[in-house]
Amino acid sequence: MAEQRIGRVNSGDVSLFYRAFGAPGGKTPILILHGSNYYDSYDWIGVASALAIDREVVTPDRRGWGESTWSPSKDYSRDALLDDILAVTAGVRWDKFILMGHSGAGPVIISFAVNFPDRLEKLVIVDSQMNRDENAGAGQKIGNPPQIWPTVEAAMAPFAKLNNPPRFGLDRERALQALIKTEQGYMLKRDPDNANTNAIGEGAALPARRLVREMWMELGMVKTPAILVRGLQSDRFPPETVERFTKEYPHIPQFPVNSQHDVPRMAPDALIGHTKKFIGSV
Protein backbone atom coordinates (compact mmCIF):
# COMPACT_ATOMS: atom_id res chain seq x y z
CA MET A 1 0.00 0.00 0.00
CA ALA A 2 1.23 3.48 -0.88
CA GLU A 3 1.79 5.94 1.97
CA GLN A 4 -0.53 8.89 2.40
CA ARG A 5 0.37 12.55 1.98
CA ILE A 6 -1.99 15.43 2.64
CA GLY A 7 -2.26 18.81 0.98
CA ARG A 8 -4.46 21.81 0.32
CA VAL A 9 -5.31 23.94 -2.68
CA ASN A 10 -7.44 27.07 -2.97
CA SER A 11 -10.46 27.10 -5.28
CA GLY A 12 -12.68 30.16 -5.39
CA ASP A 13 -13.64 30.96 -1.80
CA VAL A 14 -12.70 27.58 -0.30
CA SER A 15 -9.60 25.67 0.73
CA LEU A 16 -9.78 22.09 -0.50
CA PHE A 17 -8.15 19.32 1.54
CA TYR A 18 -6.85 16.28 -0.31
CA ARG A 19 -5.09 12.99 0.33
CA ALA A 20 -2.41 11.87 -2.12
CA PHE A 21 -0.87 8.44 -2.61
CA GLY A 22 1.90 7.15 -4.85
CA ALA A 23 4.72 8.94 -6.60
CA PRO A 24 4.17 11.63 -9.23
CA GLY A 25 5.42 10.87 -12.71
CA GLY A 26 4.20 7.28 -13.04
CA LYS A 27 1.31 6.08 -15.16
CA THR A 28 -1.79 8.21 -15.70
CA PRO A 29 -2.91 9.55 -12.29
CA ILE A 30 -6.36 8.99 -10.80
CA LEU A 31 -8.63 11.53 -9.11
CA ILE A 32 -11.29 9.97 -6.84
CA LEU A 33 -14.32 12.01 -5.77
CA HIS A 34 -16.31 10.79 -2.78
CA GLY A 35 -20.08 10.77 -2.62
CA SER A 36 -22.38 13.21 -0.90
CA ASN A 37 -24.39 12.49 2.25
CA TYR A 38 -21.93 11.13 4.85
CA TYR A 39 -18.87 10.31 2.77
CA ASP A 40 -15.53 12.06 2.40
CA SER A 41 -11.98 11.22 1.31
CA TYR A 42 -11.40 9.16 4.48
CA ASP A 43 -13.63 6.45 3.01
CA TRP A 44 -11.29 6.09 0.04
CA ILE A 45 -7.93 5.67 1.78
CA GLY A 46 -7.79 1.90 1.24
CA VAL A 47 -8.83 1.93 -2.42
CA ALA A 48 -6.67 4.94 -3.28
CA SER A 49 -3.54 3.51 -1.68
CA ALA A 50 -4.02 0.17 -3.46
CA LEU A 51 -4.42 1.88 -6.85
CA ALA A 52 -1.32 4.02 -6.29
CA ILE A 53 1.26 1.26 -6.73
CA ASP A 54 2.29 2.51 -10.19
CA ARG A 55 0.77 6.01 -10.29
CA GLU A 56 -0.31 8.98 -8.21
CA VAL A 57 -3.84 8.90 -6.80
CA VAL A 58 -5.52 11.91 -5.17
CA THR A 59 -8.85 12.06 -3.36
CA PRO A 60 -10.08 15.46 -2.10
CA ASP A 61 -12.78 16.38 0.37
CA ARG A 62 -15.60 18.10 -1.46
CA ARG A 63 -16.10 21.80 -0.69
CA GLY A 64 -18.10 22.03 2.53
CA TRP A 65 -17.24 18.45 3.52
CA GLY A 66 -14.66 16.89 5.82
CA GLU A 67 -11.48 18.92 6.16
CA SER A 68 -12.26 21.23 3.23
CA THR A 69 -13.66 24.61 4.25
CA TRP A 70 -17.25 25.74 3.92
CA SER A 71 -18.01 28.20 1.14
CA PRO A 72 -18.68 31.68 2.62
CA SER A 73 -20.79 32.47 -0.46
CA LYS A 74 -22.63 29.15 -0.13
CA ASP A 75 -21.58 28.26 -3.65
CA TYR A 76 -22.07 24.53 -4.16
CA SER A 77 -23.02 24.88 -7.81
CA ARG A 78 -21.97 22.54 -10.59
CA ASP A 79 -19.65 25.28 -11.88
CA ALA A 80 -17.93 25.45 -8.48
CA LEU A 81 -17.52 21.68 -8.26
CA LEU A 82 -16.03 21.49 -11.75
CA ASP A 83 -13.70 24.37 -10.91
CA ASP A 84 -12.61 22.42 -7.83
CA ILE A 85 -11.52 19.51 -10.03
CA LEU A 86 -9.52 21.93 -12.16
CA ALA A 87 -7.96 23.49 -9.05
CA VAL A 88 -6.92 20.20 -7.46
CA THR A 89 -5.44 18.79 -10.66
CA ALA A 90 -3.62 22.07 -11.32
CA GLY A 91 -2.29 22.00 -7.78
CA VAL A 92 -0.77 18.55 -8.27
CA ARG A 93 0.34 19.48 -11.81
CA TRP A 94 -1.67 16.96 -13.77
CA ASP A 95 -2.58 17.34 -17.42
CA LYS A 96 -4.57 14.23 -18.34
CA PHE A 97 -5.97 11.92 -15.70
CA ILE A 98 -8.47 9.18 -14.90
CA LEU A 99 -11.58 10.33 -13.01
CA MET A 100 -13.54 8.15 -10.57
CA GLY A 101 -16.65 9.22 -8.68
CA HIS A 102 -18.96 7.52 -6.19
CA SER A 103 -22.61 8.17 -5.40
CA GLY A 104 -23.40 11.91 -5.54
CA ALA A 105 -20.13 12.58 -7.37
CA GLY A 106 -21.55 10.80 -10.41
CA PRO A 107 -23.27 13.86 -11.94
CA VAL A 108 -20.11 15.89 -11.36
CA ILE A 109 -17.68 13.51 -13.06
CA ILE A 110 -20.06 12.97 -15.98
CA SER A 111 -20.38 16.74 -16.41
CA PHE A 112 -16.61 17.11 -16.26
CA ALA A 113 -16.20 14.46 -18.97
CA VAL A 114 -18.60 16.40 -21.22
CA ASN A 115 -17.08 19.82 -20.56
CA PHE A 116 -13.40 18.84 -20.47
CA PRO A 117 -13.03 15.70 -22.61
CA ASP A 118 -9.43 16.54 -23.49
CA ARG A 119 -8.43 16.26 -19.82
CA LEU A 120 -9.58 12.69 -19.28
CA GLU A 121 -8.21 9.30 -20.25
CA LYS A 122 -10.94 7.20 -18.63
CA LEU A 123 -14.02 7.50 -16.42
CA VAL A 124 -15.05 5.17 -13.56
CA ILE A 125 -18.60 5.59 -12.24
CA VAL A 126 -19.16 3.88 -8.88
CA ASP A 127 -22.78 3.19 -7.90
CA SER A 128 -24.14 6.62 -8.82
CA GLN A 129 -27.90 6.49 -9.11
CA MET A 130 -28.93 7.68 -12.53
CA ASN A 131 -32.45 8.96 -11.95
CA ARG A 132 -31.80 11.50 -9.23
CA ASP A 133 -29.29 14.17 -8.30
CA GLU A 134 -28.18 13.21 -4.80
CA ASN A 135 -27.17 16.81 -4.15
CA ALA A 136 -30.62 18.20 -4.85
CA GLY A 137 -31.99 18.36 -1.32
CA ALA A 138 -35.47 19.65 -0.62
CA GLY A 139 -36.28 22.46 1.78
CA GLN A 140 -34.38 25.57 2.75
CA LYS A 141 -31.11 26.01 0.86
CA ILE A 142 -29.31 28.44 3.20
CA GLY A 143 -29.52 29.25 6.88
CA ASN A 144 -29.88 25.63 7.91
CA PRO A 145 -28.63 24.81 11.43
CA PRO A 146 -25.64 22.46 11.74
CA GLN A 147 -26.37 18.87 12.68
CA ILE A 148 -25.36 18.23 16.30
CA TRP A 149 -25.82 15.10 18.42
CA PRO A 150 -25.18 14.60 22.17
CA THR A 151 -22.89 11.60 21.63
CA VAL A 152 -21.03 9.84 18.83
CA GLU A 153 -23.38 6.88 19.20
CA ALA A 154 -26.40 9.15 18.81
CA ALA A 155 -24.91 10.50 15.58
CA MET A 156 -24.33 6.99 14.25
CA ALA A 157 -27.70 5.52 15.21
CA PRO A 158 -30.02 6.87 12.49
CA PHE A 159 -27.60 5.95 9.72
CA ALA A 160 -27.01 2.44 11.02
CA LYS A 161 -30.74 1.80 10.46
CA LEU A 162 -30.71 2.72 6.76
CA ASN A 163 -31.19 0.03 4.13
CA ASN A 164 -27.76 0.89 2.71
CA PRO A 165 -25.92 2.37 5.70
CA PRO A 166 -22.72 4.36 5.18
CA ARG A 167 -19.60 3.48 7.13
CA PHE A 168 -20.36 6.50 9.31
CA GLY A 169 -23.25 4.56 10.87
CA LEU A 170 -21.30 1.38 11.54
CA ASP A 171 -17.73 2.34 12.47
CA ARG A 172 -17.22 4.56 15.53
CA GLU A 173 -13.65 5.49 14.54
CA ARG A 174 -14.87 6.57 11.13
CA ALA A 175 -17.73 8.55 12.69
CA LEU A 176 -15.27 10.40 14.92
CA GLN A 177 -13.37 11.51 11.82
CA ALA A 178 -16.55 13.15 10.53
CA LEU A 179 -17.50 14.96 13.74
CA ILE A 180 -16.25 17.97 15.71
CA LYS A 181 -16.69 18.14 19.49
CA THR A 182 -18.42 21.37 20.50
CA GLU A 183 -19.99 22.66 23.71
CA GLN A 184 -23.37 21.54 22.40
CA GLY A 185 -22.27 18.04 21.39
CA TYR A 186 -20.83 16.46 18.24
CA MET A 187 -21.25 18.46 15.04
CA LEU A 188 -21.01 17.00 11.56
CA LYS A 189 -18.10 18.33 9.46
CA ARG A 190 -20.40 19.34 6.65
CA ASP A 191 -21.93 22.67 5.71
CA PRO A 192 -25.68 22.28 6.33
CA ASP A 193 -26.20 24.56 3.31
CA ASN A 194 -24.30 22.22 0.96
CA ALA A 195 -27.35 21.78 -1.28
CA ASN A 196 -27.35 25.47 -2.22
CA THR A 197 -26.41 25.95 -5.86
CA ASN A 198 -26.87 29.73 -6.14
CA ALA A 199 -24.07 31.75 -4.58
CA ILE A 200 -24.99 34.58 -2.26
CA GLY A 201 -23.29 37.98 -2.16
CA GLU A 202 -21.31 39.31 -5.13
CA GLY A 203 -21.49 36.03 -7.04
CA ALA A 204 -25.27 35.82 -6.92
CA ALA A 205 -25.78 37.71 -10.18
CA LEU A 206 -23.19 35.77 -12.17
CA PRO A 207 -24.66 33.47 -14.83
CA ALA A 208 -23.87 29.76 -14.86
CA ARG A 209 -20.92 29.02 -17.14
CA ARG A 210 -21.82 25.40 -17.85
CA LEU A 211 -25.17 23.78 -18.45
CA VAL A 212 -26.60 21.43 -15.82
CA ARG A 213 -28.24 18.72 -17.90
CA GLU A 214 -30.40 15.75 -17.02
CA MET A 215 -28.02 12.95 -16.00
CA TRP A 216 -29.16 10.30 -18.49
CA MET A 217 -28.85 12.77 -21.35
CA GLU A 218 -25.43 13.98 -20.25
CA LEU A 219 -23.98 10.48 -19.90
CA GLY A 220 -25.02 9.88 -23.50
CA MET A 221 -22.78 12.81 -24.49
CA VAL A 222 -19.65 11.37 -22.86
CA LYS A 223 -16.95 10.31 -25.34
CA THR A 224 -14.38 9.23 -22.72
CA PRO A 225 -14.13 5.43 -22.27
CA ALA A 226 -16.15 4.61 -19.15
CA ILE A 227 -17.26 1.77 -16.90
CA LEU A 228 -19.90 1.42 -14.19
CA VAL A 229 -19.13 -0.50 -10.99
CA ARG A 230 -22.37 -1.04 -9.06
CA GLY A 231 -23.41 -2.89 -5.93
CA LEU A 232 -25.64 -5.91 -6.42
CA GLN A 233 -27.49 -5.06 -3.19
CA SER A 234 -27.43 -1.29 -3.74
CA ASP A 235 -30.69 0.61 -3.53
CA ARG A 236 -29.35 2.98 -6.20
CA PHE A 237 -29.69 0.37 -8.93
CA PRO A 238 -33.08 -1.35 -8.84
CA PRO A 239 -33.82 -3.71 -11.77
CA GLU A 240 -35.57 -1.05 -13.85
CA THR A 241 -32.54 1.26 -13.62
CA VAL A 242 -30.16 -1.55 -14.57
CA GLU A 243 -32.41 -2.40 -17.52
CA ARG A 244 -32.50 1.17 -18.77
CA PHE A 245 -28.75 1.66 -18.31
CA THR A 246 -28.03 -1.54 -20.24
CA LYS A 247 -30.35 -0.50 -23.06
CA GLU A 248 -29.21 3.12 -23.39
CA TYR A 249 -25.47 2.62 -22.82
CA PRO A 250 -24.50 -0.77 -24.26
CA HIS A 251 -20.99 0.62 -24.85
CA ILE A 252 -20.41 1.19 -21.10
CA PRO A 253 -19.46 -2.10 -19.41
CA GLN A 254 -21.12 -2.81 -16.08
CA PHE A 255 -19.36 -4.64 -13.27
CA PRO A 256 -21.73 -5.73 -10.48
CA VAL A 257 -19.99 -6.38 -7.15
CA ASN A 258 -21.20 -8.02 -3.95
CA SER A 259 -21.98 -4.81 -2.09
CA GLN A 260 -24.60 -2.35 -1.01
CA HIS A 261 -24.14 1.31 -1.95
CA ASP A 262 -20.92 1.79 0.04
CA VAL A 263 -18.76 -0.04 -2.49
CA PRO A 264 -15.34 1.16 -1.21
CA ARG A 265 -16.16 -0.32 2.21
CA MET A 266 -17.95 -3.51 1.22
CA ALA A 267 -16.20 -4.54 -2.01
CA PRO A 268 -12.86 -2.72 -2.17
CA ASP A 269 -10.93 -5.60 -3.73
CA ALA A 270 -13.49 -6.07 -6.50
CA LEU A 271 -13.54 -2.34 -7.22
CA ILE A 272 -9.75 -2.20 -7.31
CA GLY A 273 -9.59 -5.23 -9.58
CA HIS A 274 -12.14 -3.95 -12.09
CA THR A 275 -10.51 -0.52 -12.12
CA LYS A 276 -7.01 -1.90 -12.69
CA LYS A 277 -8.22 -4.11 -15.53
CA PHE A 278 -10.07 -1.19 -17.14
CA ILE A 279 -7.22 1.32 -16.98
CA GLY A 280 -4.62 -1.28 -17.96
CA SER A 281 -1.23 0.14 -18.82
CA VAL A 282 -2.47 3.71 -19.38
Report the location of each language-model feature.
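Catalytic histidine-centered segment of alpha/beta-hydrolase-like enzymes
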Residues: 259-272
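Conserved catalytic-core motifs of eukaryotic protein kinase domains, centered on the activation segment
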Residues: 42-44, 68-74, 134-137, 239-240
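Alpha/beta-hydrolase fold catalytic core
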Residues: 1-32, 53-55, 94-95, 250-253, ...
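Flexible "cap/lid" loop of the alpha/beta hydrolase fold
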Residues: 110-114, 121-154
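Active-site loop/oxyanion-hole signature of alpha/beta-hydrolase fold enzymes
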Residues: 45, 49, 53, 58-100, ...
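Conserved HGGG/HGGXW glycine-rich cap/lid loop of the alpha/beta-hydrolase fold
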Residues: 14-70
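Conserved alpha/beta-hydrolase catalytic His-Asp/Glu region
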Residues: 150-203, 209
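Conserved serine/cysteine hydrolase catalytic core
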Residues: 182-248, 258
